[in-house]
């Protein structure tokens, strides 16, 4: 470029700034100096070097984001939630938590979530440990373990933690592995993908009771502490001395723990003397000897765990090289340590990859350093190798039953093999093991995120690859945060992250689609999106993880044709989810199909565009199905006996429970009335009735979709028809209960109503009044539940007959040839599987509001012209037409939706009654707070603080999740006012 024009009018002088010669004639490229590290970043690195446990932000599988305040005195709770106005997700405001008062042990320094249930361990500077349980709501925990009795001793400071994984389960038919459905490989030149299922072997040890974990912690003086839950729920402690650290150089600065395929724990400790020490720890729970998971110990058997150890290997983690001459002392200090457990690399040959120990050291140059130095992090790695097989050490040999003992003989000749280090020119602030332990995720202070293969350390997801998909990052998504970052917590799905920034703010960032403009993506890209989202959702389902941040990203593609329905179709086909309930199977099988609930939740959320906008038709069907399921569950739980503290009780003996069910009964009878009214309107529609004379069902379905009509699909689809039938029978059950309760009270208790000496009189009077309200709704219903159930039963029989006739051609004829008789059973089984797949395909399409199979047209024609016609003759059609169905929240008229929103009217998810802030119940003069679903924004009054009776408390605990599967959170009072 022209830099200086010659003053004498000659040619301008050209100066090349890309490469300026220095005094010695060497090329010296001009580069901008790296931004100096801030004071807060340097302080953060000092904290990482001083203690192994100082993670002050963490994200749970259930959705709670916990962070420690900058002053270290309280924990702040957040979660991502859907906005009721436009259905987009955002980060909630913090809910402060500081119920512990003063902190004699110094500030809070570390948070860690249990992978099994919603338990949060909070650790202070001297190692005191508090455990909170978040099973009920996202932001209001209960206390599981106090720390009042913990010692105030610096040597007890915790430098490493590890939660035991989930117990694989007592069901012998349950696979001993977690399925991973990646990669998805494109088949040929089509846009279809084949998902390769890979088994991820579960390695112990585990807590012997399902859905419970235990926390392992390593202290500065080399003590292992095991915090575990007794069968009665009390958390107890067991200890084991790993090292006798009485000298300063022997103190442990950082520690990592992982499970091993020998069903033991492996502990790696980094000491002040720059040593890495590997110790194998055996865990015996003291339970009766049992062979295999099928003979799991009973849940009420007292546990008495014992720990044993064996030292395996020692090496030095720091060996200065020539490149370290000008580095400061920080390079001789670790910031992170991780243990990567052995992985099954070849299930056929039973080959395992070795265990890997990983450490990170980071260097930040001083601003006035005379040397040309760059910011850098050095990632060191060692493999734990075995020279020869030895007999099991005596102190581990007595570990009891097979599940808790060493599964294969450990080695005495173990050694640590140093691998080549990896150097990056930025500061590592976080190391996470993801994708079932196969991938390492590094987060950096500049907000960048990097995924590397655990074995080769090659960077992953760098290039777009639509032919072989391991992660959504392969199909055009990028992940990053903002610069000036001190800590990062990845979501359990890896679809988003939260940052703790230098200014103390917590910020949420989702992955971003960068491959193409979302409005212009082609079919191949949509198919790749479906495959990537399916892999992530299936992995979340197999690990019990909430999928809210997956849905937050999917919201960007909700307007793409068939994205949501193809996503659910692929999920059902890949995970073999049952959607065919044509046969008369018990309703329990349908109700307990939790994966089907997740699929309905996906279409429910993506079909919802905010409370002031109409829902997509398939989203409306999913909403009704989810609410049906929730109501059936609530009535079932209320009707059954429960055992609490060795006492058997029936929730329906409490007036609070009956009053809560009154609204459910009203909602249920309104739903049946609305459904019949919709079907009767179709019966009176000449256009629709004429379509029943056509041989194909596509014209009929197209007309229904144009009218936003879903009633016919609700009764044709076996899953929703089964839920409707279950609801009818629950209504009849409650009608019977209320009739008997009223009769019992009027014949036995009413004469004693004025007996002031009988304390039961007032309670029985309240229960009598509640049952009268329930009976009023069941007896005045416009549609009798028993009659409608018979209508559904008749339709179900016709559908089964139609399936049998239409799919009979798929069944191979039986051969009388004696030579073929040996193949007859196999052939029959194959034919039955083919028929089952055919029905599954048809049922899945109807569940997603697509056209029924063509042979259903005759079934629908008979249903309308015979069964429904006779049913209509015995119904007051006018009352149905003019009835108020606002309780169902199903009317899609924009004006009605806006009016409802303006009045602040909502329907209580629990009691199924209309609520508003003006009409909300009060406690001590204060309106009750509301709980809201993080996924669909449904609300309910928070009755937990005022409901002390066991029956209603039991039901409220069952509503920690919304009907859509999203978690509930308590809203601040100011948010309730604007709701």
PLM features: what roles do these ranges have?
Residues 2-979:
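Extended alpha-helical solenoid scaffolds
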């Amino acid at each position: 470029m022209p830099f200086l024009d010659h003053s004498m009018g000659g040619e301008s002088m050209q100066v090349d700034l890309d490469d300026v010669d220095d005094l010695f004639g060497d090329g010296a490229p001009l580069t901008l100096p790296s931004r100096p590290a801030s004071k807060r970043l340097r302080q953060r690195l000092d904290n990482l070097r001083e203690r192994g446990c100082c993670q002050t932000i963490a994200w749970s599988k259930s959705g709670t984001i916990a962070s420690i305040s900058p002053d270290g005195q309280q924990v702040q709770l957040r979660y991502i939630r859907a906005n009721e106005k436009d259905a987009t997700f955002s980060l909630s405001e913090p809910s402060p938590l500081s119920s512990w008062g003063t902190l004699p042990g110094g500030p809070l320094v570390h948070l860690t979530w249990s992978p099994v249930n919603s338990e949060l361990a909070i650790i202070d500077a001297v190692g005191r440990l508090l455990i909170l349980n978040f099973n009920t709501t996202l932001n209001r925990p209960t206390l599981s373990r106090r720390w009042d009795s913990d010692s105030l001793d610096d040597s007890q400071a915790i430098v490493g933690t590890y939660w035991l994984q989930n117990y694989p389960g007592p069901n012998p038919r349950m696979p001993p592995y977690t399925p991973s459905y990646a990669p998805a490989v494109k088949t040929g030149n089509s846009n279809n993908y084949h998902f390769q299922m890979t088994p991820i072997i579960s390695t112990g040890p585990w807590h012997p009771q399902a859905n419970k974990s235990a926390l392992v912690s390593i202290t500065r003086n080399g003590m292992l502490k095991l915090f575990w839950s007794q069968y009665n729920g009390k958390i107890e402690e067991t200890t084991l001395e790993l090292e006798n650290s009485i000298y300063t150089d022997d103190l442990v600065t950082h520690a990592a723990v992982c499970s091993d395929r020998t069903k033991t724990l492996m502990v790696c400790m980094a000491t002040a003397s720059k040593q890495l020490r590997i110790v194998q720890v055996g865990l015996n729970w003291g339970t009766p000897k049992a062979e295999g998971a099928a003979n799991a110990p009973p849940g009420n058997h007292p546990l008495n765990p014992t720990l044993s150890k064996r030292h395996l290997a020692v090496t030095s983690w720091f060996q200065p090289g020539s490149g370290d001459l000008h580095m400061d002392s920080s390079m001789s200090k670790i910031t992170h340590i991780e243990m990567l457990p052995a992985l099954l690399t070849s299930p056929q040959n039973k080959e395992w990859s070795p265990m890997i120990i990983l450490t990170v050291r980071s260097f930040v140059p001083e601003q006035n350093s005379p040397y040309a130095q760059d910011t850098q992090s050095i990632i060191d790695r060692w493999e734990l190798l075995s020279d020869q097989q030895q007999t099991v050490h005596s102190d581990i040999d007595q570990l009891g039953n097979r599940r808790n003992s060493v599964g294969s003989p450990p080695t005495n000749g173990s050694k640590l093999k140093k691998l080549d280090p990896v150097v990056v020119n930025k500061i590592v602030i976080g190391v996470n093991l993801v994708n079932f332990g196969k991938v390492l995720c590094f987060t950096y202070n500049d907000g960048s995120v990097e995924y590397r293969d655990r074995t080769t350390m090659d960077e992953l997801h760098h290039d777009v690859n639509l032919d072989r998909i391991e992660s959504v990052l392969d199909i055009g998504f990028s992940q990053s945060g903002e610069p000036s970052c001190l800590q990062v917590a990845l979501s359990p799905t890896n679809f988003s992250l939260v940052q703790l920034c230098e200014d103390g703010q917590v910020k949420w960032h989702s992955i971003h689609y960068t491959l193409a403009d979302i409005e212009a993506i082609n079919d191949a890209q949509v198919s790749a999106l479906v495959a990537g989202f399916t892999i992530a959702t299936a992995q979340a389902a197999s690990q019990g993880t909430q999928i809210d941040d997956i849905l937050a990203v999917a919201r960007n593609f909700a307007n793409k044709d068939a994205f949501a329905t193809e996503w659910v179709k692929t999920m059902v086909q890949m995970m073999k989810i049952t959607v065919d309930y044509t046969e008369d199977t018990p309703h329990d099988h349908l109700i307990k199909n939790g994966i089907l609930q997740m699929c309905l939740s996906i279409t429910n959320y993506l079909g919802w565009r905010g409370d002031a906008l109409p829902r997509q038709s398939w989203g409306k069907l999913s909403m009704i199905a989810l609410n049906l399921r929730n109501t059936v569950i609530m009535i079932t739980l209320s009707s059954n006996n429960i055992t609490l503290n060795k006492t058997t009780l029936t929730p329906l003996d409490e007036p609070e429970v009956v009053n809560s069910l009154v609204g459910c009964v009203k909602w249920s009878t309104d739903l049946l009335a609305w459904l019949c009214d919709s079907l009767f309107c179709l019966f009176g529609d000449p256009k629709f009735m004429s379509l029943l004379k056509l041989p194909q069902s596509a014209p009929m379905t197209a007309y229904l979709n144009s009218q936003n009509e879903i009633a016919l699909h609700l009764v044709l689809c076996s899953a929703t028809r089964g839920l409707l039938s279950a609801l009818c029978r629950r209504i009849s059950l409650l009608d019977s209960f209320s009739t008997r309760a009223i009769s019992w009270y009027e014949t036995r208790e009413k004469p004693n109503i004025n007996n002031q000496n009988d304390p039961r009189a007032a309670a029985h009077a309240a229960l009598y009044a509640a049952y009268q309200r329930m009976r009023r709704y069941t007896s005045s219903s416009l549609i009798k539940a028993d009659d409608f159930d018979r209508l559904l039963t008749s339709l179900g029989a016709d559908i089964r007959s139609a399936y049998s006739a239409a799919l009979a051609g798929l069944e191979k004829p039986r051969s009388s040839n004696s030579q073929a008789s040996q193949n007859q059973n196999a052939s029959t089984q194959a034919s039955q599987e083919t028929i089952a797949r055919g029905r599954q395909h048809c049922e899945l399409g109807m569940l997603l509001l697509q056209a029924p199979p063509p042979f259903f047209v005759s079934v629908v024609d008979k249903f309308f012209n015979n069964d429904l016609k006779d049913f209509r003759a015995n119904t007051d059609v006018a009352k149905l037409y003019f009835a108020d169905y606002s309780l169902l929240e199903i009317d899609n008229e924009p004006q009605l939706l806006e009016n409802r929103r303006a009045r602040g009217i909502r329907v209580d998810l629990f009691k199924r009654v209309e609520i508003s802030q003006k009409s909300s119940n009060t406690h001590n003069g204060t309106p009750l707070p509301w709980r809201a679903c993080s996924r669909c924004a449904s609300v309910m009054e928070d009755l937990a603080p005022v409901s002390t009776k066991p029956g209603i408390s039991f039901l409220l605990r069952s509503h920690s999740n919304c009907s859509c599967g999203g978690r509930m959170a308590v809203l601040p009072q100011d948010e309730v006012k604007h709701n």
